[in-house]
């Protein structure tokens, strides 16, 4: 062999051995404290990728759960949950069922507020049971975790990270009551940033801006009731008065499952990272069963229909209306539904208990997507460029539908008031009107035009926090100011006092000068007149 070639090869081999011996690739330890439902499904992809990169992950979950089950890429650690599975599912699934019950707006509002209160109480009691489990807390403390990855919608993970003094990375869509804005000290002008649940866009009329400004006041009481249990628990554990905002403010990085293709543009802070579409990065080939359904659809293609994991059954009358509408279009309908089969179900409609939603939407034959407007489904529609018919049921789904409708990428239906004709017309509109396909493809192109995939970006920031043991340099000094310092009210008051003092001195000086200049002449004139008389 040519000795000139061997020398470089020997050098390259030595370099590779040296690189393998370096300690930089040593894995870290991640404590994962997830939220139930679709929140966990996208966080799970991050945990899987962290495991693939050599990190150890421990997922802390309640004994009673719907979606969180043990898998080979993490260790599942459970804790006692003070509710039965039936009670838990009743509370979790209750909001979805109410979406199909017609009732007055005022009643709906107060029932929604009561549901939010029950939801927070349920998780607050669960959190108290966990944090008072001294054996488990000692075990977690001795495990020397490098970072806590948690969803602050369930603030217990943030509280645990604060208590154990471990850097935290938050993985979220948003936090109720606007707490995420307060905890990040992110500006939120009500003139163009719509509040959650208002169903407003970023272009508001005067009356809409009035509504947007007053809306948080209507939630003030229920928000106070909802967060008080966590604040009491935080104060008890940390031995000082602690607000929930203060607990959440110690997050190193906030990973928001959003971007400005879907969300309205707004100010952001240095420790806020946007990973919208993270749930639709990983795609798999269709199984033989679903491939057969798609191929059999012919030139008309398929429509994917799913109202999310929280909707297991629809009232019979409404289900029959939906089935009637679906039977009127030429496309093949793949409907994820576990309820009673409608008696009028057409031949073109296939009921399945589960479907690979993202993979089906990514197929060239996907013509439309009927969705409840959850953020995961919306992003899968955007990623794959499929126009949507949206049937929002509760929570932020109404806001999500409003965003997509504003962008001309879908049609929104009121699930309570819609008829079979309404659904039929909406489907035909988004399928046959080319503008909807063009708009969603434009959004898809914008969304995909990025320097790094959302999953890689999320994993990078988790590893970043592990490497640097937090990210205090990204935390704005606004956290250390009082409310009057933040708004510079003390400075304004000081400057105003100076101005008023100067004005007062000038006024007094002028008054004194006037008296000196004109007061003496007046007295002279008066005395002169008295002498002439």
UniProtKB/Swiss-Prot annotation:
Q: Which EC main class describes this enzyme? A: transferase
EC number(s) given by UniProt: 2.4.1.17
Q: Give the matching Pfam families.
A: UDPGT
Alphabetized, the UniProt keywords read:
Endoplasmic reticulum, Glycoprotein, Glycosyltransferase, Membrane, Microsome, Signal, Transferase, Transmembrane, Transmembrane helix
Q: Which PROSITE patterns match?
A: UDPGT (PS00375)
Q: Which domain of life is it from?
A: Eukaryota
Q: Span of the secretion signal?
A: 1-27
- Protein's cellular compartments: Microsome; Endoplasmic reticulum membrane
The answer, when asked if Cell inner membrane is one of the entry's keywords, is: no
Give the sugar-modified residues: 133, 141, 295, 433
Q: How does it sit in the membrane?
A: Single-pass membrane protein
Tell me, which GO biological process terms does this entry list? animal organ regeneration; bile acid secretion; estrogen metabolic process; flavonoid metabolic process; liver development; vitamin D3 metabolic process; xenobiotic metabolic process
Q: Which reaction does it catalyse?
A: glucuronate acceptor + UDP-alpha-D-glucuronate = acceptor beta-D-glucuronoside + UDP + H(+)
Among PANTHER family, the record links this protein to:
EG:EG0003.4 PROTEIN-RELATED, UDP GLUCURONOSYLTRANSFERASE FAMILY 1 MEMBER A1
Family, per the entry? Belongs to the UDP-glycosyltransferase family.
What does the UniProt function comment say about this protein? UDPGT is of major importance in the conjugation and subsequent elimination of potentially toxic xenobiotics and endogenous compounds.
The protein, known as: UDP-glucuronosyltransferase 1-2
Species name: Rattus norvegicus (Rat)
Q: Which gene encodes it?
A: Ugt1a2
């Amino acid at each position: 062999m040519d000795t000139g070639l061997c020398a470089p090869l020997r050098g390259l081999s030595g370099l590779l051995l040296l690189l393998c011996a370096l300690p930089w690739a040593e894995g870290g330890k991640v404590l994962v404290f997830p939220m139930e439902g679709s929140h966990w499904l996208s966080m799970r992809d991050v945990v899987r990728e962290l495991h693939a990169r050599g990190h150890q992950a421990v997922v802390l979950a309640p004994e009673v759960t719907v979606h969180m089950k043990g898998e080979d890429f993490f260790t599942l650690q459970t804790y006692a949950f003070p509710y039965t599975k039936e009670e838990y599912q009743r509370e979790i699934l209750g909001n979805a069922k109410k979406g199909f019950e017609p009732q007055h707006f005022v009643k709906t509002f107060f029932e929604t507020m009561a549901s939010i209160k029950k939801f927070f109480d349920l998780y607050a009691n669960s959190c108290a049971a966990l944090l008072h489990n001294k054996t488990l807390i000692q075990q977690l403390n001795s495990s020397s975790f490098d970072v806590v990855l948690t969803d602050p919608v369930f603030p217990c993970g943030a509280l645990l990270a604060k208590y154990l003094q471990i850097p935290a990375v938050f993985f979220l869509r948003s936090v109720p009551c606007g707490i995420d804005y307060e905890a990040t000290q992110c500006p939120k002008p009500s003139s163009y940033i719509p509040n959650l649940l208002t169903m407003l866009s970023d272009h508001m009329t005067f009356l809409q801006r009035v509504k947007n400004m007053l809306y948080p006041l209507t939630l003030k009481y229920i928000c106070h009731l909802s967060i008080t249990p966590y604040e009491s628990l935080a104060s008890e554990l940390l031995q000082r008065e602690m607000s929930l905002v203060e607990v959440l403010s110690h997050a190193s990085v906030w990973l928001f499952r959003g971007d400005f293709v879907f969300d309205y543009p707004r100010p952001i802070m240095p420790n806020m990272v946007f990973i919208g579409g993270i749930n639709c990065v990983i795609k798999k080939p269709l199984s033989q069963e679903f491939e057969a359904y798609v191929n059999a659809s012919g030139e008309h293609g398929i429509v994917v229909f799913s109202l999310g994991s929280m909707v297991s059954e629809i009232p019979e009358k409404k289900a029959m209306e939906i089935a009637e509408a679906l039977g009127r279009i030429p496309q093949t309908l793949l409907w994820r539904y576990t309820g009673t089969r409608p008696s009028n179900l057409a031949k073109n409609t296939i009921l399945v208990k589960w479907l690979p939603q993202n993979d089906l939407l990514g197929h060239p034959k996907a013509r439309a997507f009927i969705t409840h407007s959850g953020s995961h489904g919306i992003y899968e529609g955007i990623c794959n460029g499929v126009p949507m018919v949206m049937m929002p049921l509760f929570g932020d789904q109404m806001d999500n539908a409003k965003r997509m409708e504003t962008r001309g990428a879908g049609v929104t239906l009121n699930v309570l008031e819609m008829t079979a004709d309404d659904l039929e017309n909406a489907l035909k509109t988004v399928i046959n009107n080319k503008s909807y396909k063009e708009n969603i493809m434009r959004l898809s192109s914008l969304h995909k035009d990025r320097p790094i995939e959302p999953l890689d970006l999320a994993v990078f920031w988790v590893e970043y926090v592990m490497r640097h043991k937090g990210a205090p340099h990204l935390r704005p000094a606004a956290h250390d100011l009082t409310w009057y310092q933040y708004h510079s009210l003390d400075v304004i008051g000081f400057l105003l006092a100076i101005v008023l003092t100067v004005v007062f001195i000038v006024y007094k000086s002028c008054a004194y000068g006037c008296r000196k200049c004109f007061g003496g002449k007046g007295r002279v004139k008066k005395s002169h007149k008295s002498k002439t008389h």
